């Protein structure tokens, strides 16, 4: 019986023989089977079903952690069985909200001024400037009905994310119809919009930072570094606007309302939760369940992000429930590009439980319409009807055709901007003053070097959200290897802190050495950036180093492709963590992996960080003494310099070729919220002592070479720490260098 064997060849194999099948049914002896030229693919997750969407690993990791807090909160809500239970929860939520956002500034003189009046049929528009804080000016227009008898209700209209603010035609329709129905309306410019642009550039007649949301995130990031939320200033401007309304003899203090659309809906929810004077609240296209928002559309901007909010058990729906049973109308559209309708429905259902328990279920309503992100005619009618109902105003709620005013007519300042008219302070200025107190405390702590270093070790782990490896990393997984001249490149993955893998390219010299010094190589553009033949990594390998080029979570293969760029950083903020802290944990895990290799000297493992990757690396090195030496190339010199200067850049956020409209994409993946309450990057450098550290080409807050003066100022403490540890010679600071290899060699000396 004959047996037939079939040779199955992959597509990359070619038979270099002529007419095999026509000349013979068997392979000739001299047949040459060879591989066709193959281009290297250095993606570790190539053809890997489980990790086939690595761009979602970071956000999913953060969502999973947030869900733990959401589940705890859901359990608390399920146990509320009486009006008394809900009242106790409301008090608890109020305390937490004040802890998260406050303390608010002291109330000072509003110093209101009227800069002009527009008279129209049936009403007038007064142009108002007031000071919510000394020298912090807010512009607005007050719509006042004619022929007022007694006192009338008043509504604060806070505005969503459009650049012209209340001058936008949609908001004019709202203001016009409310005032025609006998209600005073005060529409104000939020920070970063209208005439309250925070970074106005007269040369381009626009913000030098970008559109309103970009400004909000820009100064919001500075606030986060100082351990606060910029939401405080949006809320405070609104509360002080209500203070102004109550100075008007026409206003009924018992009939105060607030409404807003989109970002204005956000601030509406905030003000109504914090200010008990608000009787009626109408947040439009905002109120939703935090859980659903996070898993669908993701984080929106800095003012919607409460520092450690979710970790403290506070969610968006709490903002509705804390004011029960006061009248509240939610409006939403089904095809919203930014917000989740399912979440809004669930928020309504949960809040309805509270209103039911208070015996006033009718005080909470929700109206939906099928539309994109907008206030449709149906929704506008619902707004007018709801206010008229709860303010006891008779008449027809139907919408009238509004007479539009031009932006020029509604201009409050003669120059069109507060900054070019009165100057005054912006959010940056106020936050800088608050931060100066933190810096002063930090300098005092640094005087006791040993105690300060011990404190930094503890507080930096807590604030950054660093999680130490638990020793359960498991075995590495190999997904391919290439042989190059003199060394090999292996594609490996090791377990991260959660349900994700850390991709590594392992470069190993093909020599006869029993043990090698090893390096973790971190580049913000990913592990493949210098991985090609002739790149920096090859040079290091040919000097005898084992190199683990790594994509920590959120970088390279795992860079976020699943959501908006700001989502990762802000999702970490709400759970009390940071992308930097998570990445630092990844680095320590890679070091542990290197220590397990038989051809690596576990006492000679160093690390190289390029640009932004210096941030997680210096955290990791401060926390893990097994990182023997560190080379930082182009590191930002401090977080302090970012907060204490009006303008800053970070490499992960620069938008190439964006023009002035969006010159920045302001994510927060580089930041650690609350960092300046306890430490800064120079303190972490001090924690590395007495191990070797190289600081090459330090960058200032604009990513320009740091000046000698700035370097002296920021590195004063780490120099003191190295001297204290009798290792002054182990800290090297250079502005330029001939080769990376020379710096690495020095660090291993």
Language model features by range: what are they?
Residues 23-137, 324-326, 331-503, 507-516, ...:
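Alpha/beta-hydrolase-fold serine-hydrolase catalytic core, especially in secreted/extracellular enzymes
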Residues 162-170, 208-210, 225-233, 258-269, ...:
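Alpha-helix capping and helix-loop boundary segments enriched in small/acidic/polar residues
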Residues 7-16:
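Bacterial N-terminal signal peptides
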Residues 18-22:
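Sec/Tat signal peptide C-region and signal peptidase I cleavage site
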Residues 1-4, 601:
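Positively charged n-region of N-terminal signal peptides that target proteins for export
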Residues 149-247, 288-299, 305, 510-597, ...:
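Cap/lid segment of the alpha/beta-hydrolase catalytic domain
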Residues 189, 259, 284-285, 331, ...:
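Alpha/beta-hydrolase-fold catalytic nucleophile elbow
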Residues 181, 240-312, 590-678, 683-684:
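Primarily recognizes the serine-hydrolase "nucleophile elbow" in alpha/beta-hydrolase
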């Amino acid at each position: 019986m004959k047996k037939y064997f079939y040779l199955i060849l992959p597509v990359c194999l070619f038979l270099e023989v002529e007419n095999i099948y026509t000349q013979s049914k068997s392979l000739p002896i001299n047949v040459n089977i060879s591989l066709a030229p193959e281009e290297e693919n250095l993606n570790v997750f190539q053809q890997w079903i489980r990790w086939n969407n690595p761009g979602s690993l970071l956000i999913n990791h953060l969502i999973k952690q947030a869900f733990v807090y959401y589940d705890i909160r859901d359990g608390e809500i399920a146990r509320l069985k009486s009006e008394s239970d809900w009242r106790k929860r409301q008090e608890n939520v109020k305390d937490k909200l004040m802890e998260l956002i406050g303390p608010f500034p002291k109330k000072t003189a509003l110093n209101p001024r009227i800069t002009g009046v527009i008279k129209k049929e049936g009403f007038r528009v007064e142009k108002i400037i007031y000071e919510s804080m000394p020298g912090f000016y807010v512009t607005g227009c007050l719509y006042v009905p004619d022929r007022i008898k007694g006192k009338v209700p008043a509504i604060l209209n806070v505005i969503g994310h459009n650049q012209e603010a209340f001058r936008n035609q949609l908001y004019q329709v709202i203001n016009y119809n409310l005032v025609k129905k006998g209600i005073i309306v005060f529409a104000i410019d939020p920070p970063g919009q209208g005439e309250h642009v925070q970074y106005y550039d007269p040369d381009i007649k626009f913000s030098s930072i970008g559109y309103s949301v970009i400004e909000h995130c820009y100064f919001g990031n500075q606030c986060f570094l100082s351990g606060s939320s910029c939401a405080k200033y949006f809320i405070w401007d609104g509360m002080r606007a209500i203070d102004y309304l109550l100075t008007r003899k026409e206003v009924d203090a018992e009939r105060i309302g607030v409404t807003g659309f989109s970002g204005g809906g956000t601030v509406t929810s905030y003000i109504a939760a914090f200010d008990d004077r608000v009787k009626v609240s109408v947040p439009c296209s905002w109120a939703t369940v935090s859980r659903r928002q996070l898993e669908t559309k993701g984080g929106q901007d800095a003012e919607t992000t409460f520092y450690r909010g979710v970790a403290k058990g506070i969610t968006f729906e709490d903002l509705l429930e804390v004011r029960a049973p006061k009248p509240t109308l939610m409006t939403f559209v089904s095809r919203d590009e930014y917000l989740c309708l399912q979440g809004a429905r669930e928020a309504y259902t949960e809040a309805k439980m509270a209103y039911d328990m208070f015996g006033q279920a009718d005080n909470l309503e929700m109206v939906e319409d099928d539309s994109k992100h907008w206030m449709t005619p149906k929704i506008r009618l619902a707004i007018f009807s709801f206010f008229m109902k709860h303010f006891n105003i008779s008449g027809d709620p139907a919408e009238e055709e509004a007479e539009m005013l031009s932006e020029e007519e509604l201009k409050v300042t003669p120059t069109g901007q507060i900054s070019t008219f009165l100057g005054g302070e912006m959010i940056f200025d106020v936050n800088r003053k608050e931060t100066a107190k933190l810096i002063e405390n930090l300098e005092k702590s640094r005087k006791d070097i040993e105690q300060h270093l011990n404190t930094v070790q503890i507080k930096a782990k807590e604030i950054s959200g660093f999680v130490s490896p638990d020793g359960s990393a498991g075995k590495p997984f190999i997904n391919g290897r290439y042989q190059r001249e003199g060394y090999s490149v292996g594609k490996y993955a090791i377990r991260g802190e959660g349900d994700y893998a850390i991709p590594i390219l392992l470069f190993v010299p093909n020599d006869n050495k029993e043990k090698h010094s090893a390096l973790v190589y971190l580049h913000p553009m990913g592990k493949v950036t210098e991985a090609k033949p002739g790149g920096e990594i090859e040079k290091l390998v040919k000097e005898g180093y084992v190199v683990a080029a790594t994509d920590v979570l959120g970088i390279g293969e795992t860079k976020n492709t699943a959501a908006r760029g700001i989502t990762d950083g802000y999702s970490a903020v709400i759970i009390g963590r940071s992308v930097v802290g998570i990445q630092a944990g990844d680095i320590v895990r890679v070091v542990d992996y290197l220590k397990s290799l038989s051809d690596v000297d576990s006492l000679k493992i160093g690390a190289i960080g390029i640009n932004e990757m210096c941030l997680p690396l210096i955290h990791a090195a401060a926390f893990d003494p097994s990182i023997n030496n560190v080379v930082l190339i182009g590191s930002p010199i401090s977080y302090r310099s970012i907060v204490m200067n009006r303008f800053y850049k970070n490499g992960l956020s620069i938008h190439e070729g964006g023009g002035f409209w969006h010159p920045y994409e302001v994510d927060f993946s580089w930041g650690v919220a609350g960092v300046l309450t306890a430490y800064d990057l120079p303190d972490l450098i001090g924690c590395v002592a007495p191990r070797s550290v190289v600081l090459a080409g330090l960058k200032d807050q604009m990513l320009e070479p740091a000046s000698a003066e700035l370097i002296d100022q920021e590195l004063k403490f780490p120099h003191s720490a190295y001297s204290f540890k009798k290792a002054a010679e182990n800290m090297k600071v250079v502005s330029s260098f001939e080769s990376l290899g020379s710096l690495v060699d020095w660090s291993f000396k």
